Amino acid sequence: MMKIEPIVGRYAHIDNHRIYFEEAGQGIPLLCLHTAGSDGRQYRGVLNDPMVTKDFRVIAFDMPWHGKSSPPAGWHKEDYRLTTGSYTEMIMGFARALGLERPVVMGCSIGGRIVLDLALKHATELRALIGLQTGAYVERYYDAAWLDHPEVHGGRACGAVAYGLMSPLSPAPEVWETVWHYMQGGPGVFTGDLYFYQVEGDIRGRIGEIDTKVCPLYCLTGEYDYSASPRDTEAAVARIPGAKFTVMKGLGHFPMSENPEAFLGYLRPVLDEIRQRERS
C-alpha cells in the first residue's frame, strides 16, 4: 500500500547558493537546523507530525555542502569551514529570502549552539528559539582531522561517531537511518562543521547578555549525550535569566531523528507554549 507524505521539497536560489528545503504545515514558521555533517532529513518526524503542522509551517533546509544543497562554484579551491558569521548569515538570509515573519528557530548540536548567537544578535526578528543539545562550548575530545584522512573511510568514521552519541534506548531503524545520513556526507564537511563547534564558536563569554524577554529561549537536551551533555546545557542556561531547560529522558544527541516519537513528546508542549504566548 502506497503512502504519500505531506512534505514538499523545493530549491531556492539565494545569492550564489542553490538551497534545498522541505516543508509541511501552515501557521507560525518553524525553521529547523540540522546537525554537523548531516542534513534536513533529520526533521522528517517533525515534518510529518499533524499535531505540529496544524499550527506551524515546519521548514528544514540543507546547508550548502550538505544533503541536496551543493557547494557553490569554486568550492574545490579551499577547505570548507563553518564560522559563527557565515552560519548566522546563512540562517537569517534564508529566513528573509522566504519572507518568514518572526520565525521560531530550532537547532540541534551546532544548531543548538547557533541559537545562542541568534538570541544575541537577532532576537527582535525571531519569535522564539529552541536549542537541542545546546552548549556554550564543547572541548575538543578527539582530533577531528582523522575524519578526513585519506586512509580513513570518512563516511564510516562519521557514522561511527554519530552512533556513539545516540541513546541505547532509541529504536534501531531510526538509529541506523541517522547513521546513514552521516555516512553520506561529503569529504571534509563534518570536519568543517566541527571547526565552528569545537574551535571558533565559543560563546561562553557572551551568553549572559541574552535577553529572553525579547526572545524566549527553550533548551531540550537528551540525557545520553557526552558531546553536549545535560550538564553542559544546564551550565549555559544558568547564565541566561528566563531560559527554560528540560532533560529529555532516554534520548541522545540526535533526538529528532533517533527517536522522533519520544522527542515530539517534549517538543509539542514547548510549541504549545509559544503559540499561547502569541494569543495572550
Name each model feature, range by range.
Residues 59-106, 265:
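Active-site loop/oxyanion-hole signature of alpha/beta-hydrolase fold enzymes
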Residues 17-73:
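Conserved HGGG/HGGXW glycine-rich cap/lid loop of the alpha/beta-hydrolase fold
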Residues 116-157:
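Flexible "cap/lid" loop of the alpha/beta hydrolase fold
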Residues 213, 219-221:
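Short beta-strand/loop motif that positions the catalytic acidic residue
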Residues 1-31, 52-56, 100-101, 268-280:
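Alpha/beta-hydrolase fold catalytic core
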Residues 243-280:
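Catalytic active-site module of serine/aspartate enzymes centered on a nucleophile-bearing elbow/loop
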Residues 223-228:
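Acidic catalytic loop of the alpha/beta-hydrolase fold
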Residues 140-141, 155-212:
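Conserved alpha/beta-hydrolase catalytic His-Asp/Glu region
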